[in-house]
């Protein structure tokens, strides 16, 4: 392996992504559902963005946050899936060193952004149900833009330090990553130096971002639940629960596989590698596919516009 020398570290020219170790003979076939899922994610999210853009009645906080979620999903899935499919179908296992670090940055930064957008959507739900008459005055377009900017900057700035730290570390001769994409902890395992600070920083970022967002989401839904239970009729309560169920499904689809993958990397040494890697792939693939489907089905305005578009009645 050829090493490139820098001022303070030596790094390999490239890494080798192994894909899914243990399922090498099945990777050709695994790629087909992965490709279909990615295609649905791309088409679904682009359709969602198009519908929100052209329909001015959808220029409200909920749909603006949904547009942010769609953009994040496109970036997140596109940062891993094309390379993953190239590995499975064309055995293109090599990834350049800097491309690997860029992938690490995009995966973790936009995972943070996605979590932040879901938190902002929970706040929107809370204001809409608990303060319906003041919703438009509280969540003005400028407030929505500021929230989106804060969420974006948090993801970019919070993740940058541990990506920078990895770039300054010396790497061992071993260059194989038992994964289908570059992940922070997987890359750290190839470093020939003390990685405790970088590991600690990664833990801090993950727990501070996910912990804060989940606390805000949890508190929002506690207040929402209290408000819904005070509604006079059972039909009104059922309708309120039904309208928020899509957001809860999206939250669970992101956090369950993401937390499983994150905790398994650090503490789940007894979990089979195949199971861990499959979950690590799914958390970057399933939410981007499900989000436009869930919101397209559960949100009447979006569903109607998509149907009109399919019938040729949409500009």
UniProtKB/Swiss-Prot annotation:
The record places the following residue ranges in the Extracellular compartment, namely 1-28, 79-102, 164-199, 262-276
Glycosylated residues (UniProt) = 7
Q: Cystine bridges: which residues?
A: 100-192
Instruction: State the compartments where it is located.
Output: Cell membrane
Can you tell me where the transmembrane regions are?
29-49, 58-78, 103-123, 143-163, 200-220, 241-261, 277-297
Per the annotation, which location comes first and is thus the protein's main one?
membrane
Topology feature Cytoplasmic, residues: 50-57, 124-142, 221-240, 298-315
Q: Which GO terms describe its molecular function?
A: G protein-coupled receptor activity; olfactory receptor activity
Instruction: Return the Pfam families for the record.
Output: 7tm_4
Q: Which family does it belong to?
A: Belongs to the G-protein coupled receptor 1 family.
Q: What does this protein do?
A: Odorant receptor.
Which protein, by its recorded name, is this?
Answer: Olfactory receptor 52R1
Organism expressing this protein natively: Homo sapiens (Human)
């Amino acid at each position: 392996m050829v090493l490139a020398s820098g001022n303070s570290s030596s790094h390999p020219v490239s890494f080798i992504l192994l894909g899914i170790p243990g399922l090498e003979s099945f990777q050709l076939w695994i790629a087909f559902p992965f490709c279909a899922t990615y295609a649905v994610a791309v088409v679904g999210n682009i359709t969602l963005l198009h519908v929100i853009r052209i329909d001015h009645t959808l220029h409200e906080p909920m749909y603006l946050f949904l547009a942010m979620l769609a953009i994040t999903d496109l970036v997140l899935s596109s940062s891993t899936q094309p390379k993953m499919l190239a590995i499975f179908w064309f055995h293109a296992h090599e990834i350049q060193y800097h491309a690997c670090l860029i992938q690490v940055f995009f995966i973790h930064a936009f995972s943070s952004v996605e979590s932040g957008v879901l938190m902002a959507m929970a706040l929107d739900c809370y204001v809409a149900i608990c303060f319906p008459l003041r919703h438009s005055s509280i969540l003005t377009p400028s407030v929505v833009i500021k929230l989106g900017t804060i969420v974006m900057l948090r993801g970019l700035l919070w993740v940058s330090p541990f990506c920078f730290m990895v770039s300054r570390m010396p790497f061992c001769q071993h260059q194989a990553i038992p994964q289908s994409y570059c992940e922070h902890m997987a890359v750290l395992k190839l470093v020939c130096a003390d990685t405790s600070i970088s590991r600690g920083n990664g833990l801090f970022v993950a727990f501070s971002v996910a912990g804060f967002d989940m606390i805000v989401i949890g508190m929002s839904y506690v207040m929402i639940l209290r408000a819904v239970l005070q509604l006079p009729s059972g039909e009104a309560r059922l309708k309120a629960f039904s309208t928020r169920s899509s957001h809860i499904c999206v939250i669970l689809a992101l956090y369950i596989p993401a937390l499983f993958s994150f905790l398994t990397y650090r503490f789940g040494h007894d979990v089979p590698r195949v199971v861990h890697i499959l979950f690590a792939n799914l958390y970057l693939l399933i939410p981007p596919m499900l989000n436009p489907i869930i919101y397209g089905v559960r949100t009447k305005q979006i569903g109607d516009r998509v149907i009109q578009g399919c019938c040729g009645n949409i500009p």
